[in-house]
Amino acid sequence: MVVTASPDTYLHVIDYGLKKVRLRFDRLLLQAFMAGVYIGMAGNACISLAGGFSTDPADPKAITAGVQKFIYASIFPVAFIAIIMTGAELFTGNTMTMLICWFERRITIWQLLQNWAGSFLGNWLGTMFSAYFLTYLCCPFDHDPYLSYLNYTAASKVSYGWGSCFLRGVGCNTWVCLAVWFVVACDDAAGKILALWFPIVAFVLSSYEHIIANLYTLQLCAMLGVDTSLADMIAFNLLPTLLGNLFGGCGLIGMVYFYNFYPVVGHGDDAAEGSICGSSEKEECPSLVGVPRGASVNSLAVSAIPSVFSAPRGQRESFAGESSTLVMGDIKRQRSMASTRKLGGGADKKDVQLTVRQFDETEMQSTMEDMFGLEDPRNAPKGNPGTNPPSKSPESSATGGTGAAASPTATS
C-alpha cells in the first residue's frame, strides 16, 4: 500500500470532485441511485445478522448491546467499499469534495448545488428502492426479534433531541470524509479497502447519524409499521442529521484542509477566467495532478505533465487507480511556468505540455539508438575539461567538417 503525501492527496481530491462535475445529470442520478441501493443492501445484511440476536439479559443466548453494535459496524463498510470501487455518488462524501472545488474556483456555485441536489435525490430513491423491493417484499423482518430491533432503533433515533442529533451528524460525516481522504491517498485496491473500513466502523460504533443510512432504516421502519411516526422521524432525526452531515463535511474537513493547503498548492492569484471546469463531458477540464498512479515505467515513456490550467480530461485514469508522481517542487515549477504566460479564457487556448521520459539507464540508451538514430551522449568520449575546443577553420567547413573541430562529441 502506497500512501501519498497530504498536499498531493489534496490535489487528487480536487480532481475527484472535477470528475463529478463533468457527469451528465442523468448519470449523476443513476450513480447516486446505485449508491443508495448499496447502502440499503448493506443495511439489510446488518439487520439480518445483528438484529437476529437478543440483548435481553434473561435470555441465555443473549449478547450485549456493544457486541450487537460491533456486528453491525463490521458489516456496514461493505456499502462504502462498493460505492468507492464502482464510482457511485454518495451525498455525504460529495459535501467535502465539491466544496473544496468551489473554494478553489474550479466550479460554480450552481454546479456545486446541482451535484448536491442530484446526489441526495438519487441516494434517497436508491434507499427507497432497496427498502421496499430488496427488504420489505422479500425479507421477513415483520416478526421478532427483527421487528423489536427496528422498533427500538426508530425510537432511539428520534429521542436524541435536535442538538444531539445535529452533532452526531457532524461527527458521522467527519469520519466519512476522512474515509474518502484515506481512499484517495492509497494506491491500490487492498489499501483503499483497509483504509476505508476503520473510519466507517468508528462512526457506527460512536452512534453517529448518517443521513443516507437513516433514510433506508427509517423508511423500512415506516413500511413495517413501527410505533414511531414518520413525521417524528423527519423532524427529529432526518432534518438535523442532514444539516449535521453538511456541516461536518463542509466545515470540519472541506474548509479546514482548503485553508491548510490553499497557499501551498492552490491557484491563489494565478487563477484565470478559463480555469473553471465545464459541465460538458466533451470540454477540457483542468487537472492539477500529473502522471497517473499505478502505471509502469514503460507506459510512462512519453507521458505529459499537464499544466496547472489546461490538460485533457480524457488522458487521466479512473479514480480507483489515479495518483501523481509529482513532488511539491514539480508543482511549484508548473505554477511558475503558468504565471509567466499570458493567460486568457476560451476553450481554443492551447497549453504547452512538457514530455517526461522516465527510462532507466539501459532503456534510455536503446531507445535513443533504435528509435531516434542518436548515440547516447554519455557514451561519447569526453575532452579535457580544462581546454577549449579548437575553432573551426574555413577549410574544414568547406570540406564537410572532417577535422576535430567538427566532431559533435567535442566538449568545452
UniProtKB/Swiss-Prot annotation:
One of its GO terms (biological process) is nitrite transport. Homopentamer. It comes from the Eukaryota. The keyword Lyase does not apply. Gene3D superfamilies: Glycerol uptake facilitator protein (1.20.1080.10). This is Formate-nitrite transporter 1. Changing G93S: Reduces lactate transport. Reduces sensitivity to MMV007839 inhibition. Inhibited by methyl methanethiosulfonate (MMTS). Partially inhibited by the Malaria Box compound MMV007839. Partially inhibited by BH-296, BH-317, BH-326 and BH-388 compounds. Belongs to the FNT transporter (TC 1.A.16) family. Monocarboxylate-proton symporter; active in acidic-to-neutral pH range. Transports L-lactate and formate. Probably acts as a primary L-lactate transporter in extracellular tachyzoites. GO terms for molecular function: high-affinity secondary active nitrite transmembrane transporter activity. One of its GO terms (cellular component) is plasma membrane. PROSITE patterns: FORMATE_NITRITE_TP_1 (PS01005).
